[in-house]
Amino acid sequence: MKYAFFLGCIMPNRYAGVESATRTVMEKLGVELVDMPGASCCPAPGVFGSFDQKTWLTLAARNLVIAEEMGTDIVTVCNGCYGSLYEAAHMLHENKEALAMVNEQLKEIGKEYKGTVHVRHFAELIYKEIGVDKIRENVVKPLAVNIGVHYGCHFLKPTAAKGLGNAEHPTMLDELVEATGAKSVDYKDKMMCCGAGGGVRAKELDLALSMTQEKIENMLAVGADATVNVCPFCQLQFDRGQVEIKEKLGNEYNFPVVHLSQLLGLAMGMDPKEVALDVNFISPEPLLQKLGY
């Protein structure tokens, strides 16, 4: 299997360990990730798409064209990038007027979107194409810890377009986490936003942090040792957000934050430094001690 690897903005700039872990995990699972030359921001669906749909759709289509020219589908590890690119491809497939408008814009740079590319999320690809059993087979260090899974907003919704199962009671990420030997613990308001999305973090930071704090407290209440996400923006909100919660709200949690690719990397025998857990704002030490590092 070969995929065009869409990096997005936050992962290469803030969480390079997520990229490193993703590349290593995918290589071990037999998936070749190919860089996309000239790829731009997805762009963010909750910001660009809300204020200027034409610009959002054209920029997203330009990224899709890069993958088309490479002759392969796209995979990303970011919910926002997945939401933006997937929804753009879906809209261009369903709306011929939108397709004509976009191609009129792309003509100015000598490009045309043909609609041949599919957009996959890293977690969806692993779950559907590789399978939970294959993950279990590759585990060399079972992770005997409790994990609070955070799905995020753009991974599953809009449900009708993505078709990844029940958006209110999903199991996909829980199954992948438990394939590592960890236990996925259920907690109150599991499907609530991390607090960062839709421009909330940028415009109403206090509100965003109160949502993050509520989710962390709900996970801690059921004995979670860490939270696992599938989006660098969610990772930023839980990780950097804890520093801001301490500064603004006076509460300190030191609750480890891990991307799914990093968790899979640990289970497959990668060192914590290989997946760059040591460069998070929040120390992973409480989690690593429980794992015997």
Curated annotation (Swiss-Prot):
<dbReference type="InterPro" id="IPR051278">
    <property type="entry name" value="HdrB/HdrD_reductase"/>
</dbReference>
<comment type="function">
    <text>Part of a complex that catalyzes the reversible reduction of CoM-S-S-CoB to the thiol-coenzymes H-S-CoM (coenzyme M) and H-S-CoB (coenzyme B).</text>
</comment>
<keyword id="KW-0560">Oxidoreductase</keyword>
<protein>
    <recommendedName>
        <fullName>H(2)/formate:CoB-CoM heterodisulfide,ferredoxin reductase subunit B2</fullName>
        <ecNumber>1.8.98.5</ecNumber>
        <ecNumber>1.8.98.6</ecNumber>
    </recommendedName>
</protein>
<keyword id="KW-0484">Methanogenesis</keyword>
<comment type="similarity">
    <text>Belongs to the HdrB family.</text>
</comment>
<comment type="subunit">
    <text>The heterodisulfide reductase is composed of three subunits; HdrA, HdrB and HdrC. B1 and B2 subunits are interchangeable, as are the C1 and C2 subunits. The heterodisulfide reductase forms a supercomplex with formylmethanofuran dehydrogenase (Fwd), F(420)-non-reducing hydrogenase (Vhu) and formate dehydrogenase (Fdh).</text>
</comment>
<comment type="pathway">
    <text>Cofactor metabolism; coenzyme M-coenzyme B heterodisulfide reduction; coenzyme B and coenzyme M from coenzyme M-coenzyme B heterodisulfide: step 1/1.</text>
</comment>
<dbReference type="GO" id="GO:0051912">
    <property type="term" value="F:CoB--CoM heterodisulfide reductase activity"/>
</dbReference>
<dbReference type="InterPro" id="IPR004017">
    <property type="entry name" value="Cys_rich_dom"/>
</dbReference>
<dbReference type="Pfam" id="PF02754">
    <property type="entry name" value="CCG"/>
</dbReference>
<dbReference type="InterPro" id="IPR017678">
    <property type="entry name" value="CoB/CoM_hetero-S_Rdtase_bsu"/>
</dbReference>
<dbReference type="GO" id="GO:0015948">
    <property type="term" value="P:methanogenesis"/>
</dbReference>
